[in-house]
């Protein structure tokens, strides 16, 4: 399969949507009120054999928006130090962080001949809710992600491996997971991307995708 054929397959595999893995670390559970503190995204690509794999990672520290609530319990859970000199030096505003995430996502959509990105996340509704709230709060008109459709690796992990916790699902898939590194947006996104790819590829290798195409009358035969 050529690179062009791989791009065609990616465009067809998820009905024109490009899966992009996203993780957000936040100051609580309320998307309207609580701060967005970290955001990371991993774009995916497909090799000549039709296997899905992680491509590029983009990750940013985010300055809390004005008036944002931050629960101490959330900081204790994530280990984020808001007073870290390094964090204060590199953190971006929500608007700029979203812009830096959306640019490579749009580029990947175009490169893979897709029409839109679809968010992949572990407990994806949480990340999607915070992402949509931040987009609205910052008046961003062109969100490359579908506003409500998503792929949830907690649900898929339960289906494929009988595990819904990210660390346990990764280990069931043969993916190393370091608990000490968890709850960093970059780390969690990269592990979630590996997990999603492993499940999609497992389904393909077991013949599920070919069967789905055949049942829909879309197989080459």
UniProtKB/Swiss-Prot annotation:
<feature type="site" description="Important for substrate binding and specificity">
    <location>
        <position position="29"/>
    </location>
</feature>
<feature type="site" description="Important for substrate binding and specificity">
    <location>
        <position position="77"/>
    </location>
</feature>
<feature type="site" description="Important for substrate binding and specificity">
    <location>
        <position position="148"/>
    </location>
</feature>
<dbReference type="GO" id="GO:0045004">
    <property type="term" value="P:DNA replication proofreading"/>
</dbReference>
<keyword id="KW-0479">Metal-binding</keyword>
<feature type="active site" description="Proton donor/acceptor">
    <location>
        <position position="183"/>
    </location>
</feature>
<dbReference type="GO" id="GO:0003676">
    <property type="term" value="F:nucleic acid binding"/>
</dbReference>
<comment type="similarity">
    <text>Belongs to the RNase T family.</text>
</comment>
<feature type="binding site">
    <location>
        <position position="188"/>
    </location>
    <ligand>
        <name>Mg(2+) 2</name>
    </ligand>
</feature>
<comment type="subunit">
    <text>Homodimer.</text>
</comment>
<keyword id="KW-0540">Nuclease</keyword>
<dbReference type="GO" id="GO:0016896">
    <property type="term" value="F:RNA exonuclease activity, producing 5'-phosphomonoesters"/>
</dbReference>
<protein>
    <recommendedName>
        <fullName>Ribonuclease T</fullName>
        <ecNumber>3.1.13.-</ecNumber>
    </recommendedName>
</protein>
<dbReference type="GO" id="GO:0005829">
    <property type="term" value="C:cytosol"/>
</dbReference>
<feature type="binding site">
    <location>
        <position position="25"/>
    </location>
    <ligand>
        <name>Mg(2+) 2</name>
    </ligand>
</feature>
<feature type="binding site">
    <location>
        <position position="23"/>
    </location>
    <ligand>
        <name>Mg(2+) 1</name>
    </ligand>
</feature>
<keyword id="KW-0819">tRNA processing</keyword>
<dbReference type="InterPro" id="IPR012337">
    <property type="entry name" value="RNaseH-like_sf"/>
</dbReference>
<dbReference type="Pfam" id="PF00929">
    <property type="entry name" value="RNase_T"/>
</dbReference>
<dbReference type="GO" id="GO:0008408">
    <property type="term" value="F:3'-5' exonuclease activity"/>
</dbReference>
<dbReference type="GO" id="GO:0000287">
    <property type="term" value="F:magnesium ion binding"/>
</dbReference>
<keyword id="KW-0378">Hydrolase</keyword>
<feature type="binding site">
    <location>
        <position position="183"/>
    </location>
    <ligand>
        <name>Mg(2+) 2</name>
    </ligand>
</feature>
<feature type="domain" description="Exonuclease">
    <location>
        <begin position="20"/>
        <end position="196"/>
    </location>
</feature>
<dbReference type="GO" id="GO:0008033">
    <property type="term" value="P:tRNA processing"/>
</dbReference>
<keyword id="KW-0269">Exonuclease</keyword>
<feature type="site" description="Important for substrate binding and specificity">
    <location>
        <position position="126"/>
    </location>
</feature>
<feature type="binding site">
    <location>
        <position position="23"/>
    </location>
    <ligand>
        <name>Mg(2+) 2</name>
    </ligand>
</feature>
<dbReference type="InterPro" id="IPR013520">
    <property type="entry name" value="Exonuclease_RNaseT/DNA_pol3"/>
</dbReference>
<keyword id="KW-0460">Magnesium</keyword>
<dbReference type="InterPro" id="IPR005987">
    <property type="entry name" value="RNase_T"/>
</dbReference>
<comment type="function">
    <text>Trims short 3' overhangs of a variety of RNA species, leaving a one or two nucleotide 3' overhang. Responsible for the end-turnover of tRNA: specifically removes the terminal AMP residue from uncharged tRNA (tRNA-C-C-A). Also appears to be involved in tRNA biosynthesis.</text>
</comment>
<dbReference type="InterPro" id="IPR036397">
    <property type="entry name" value="RNaseH_sf"/>
</dbReference>
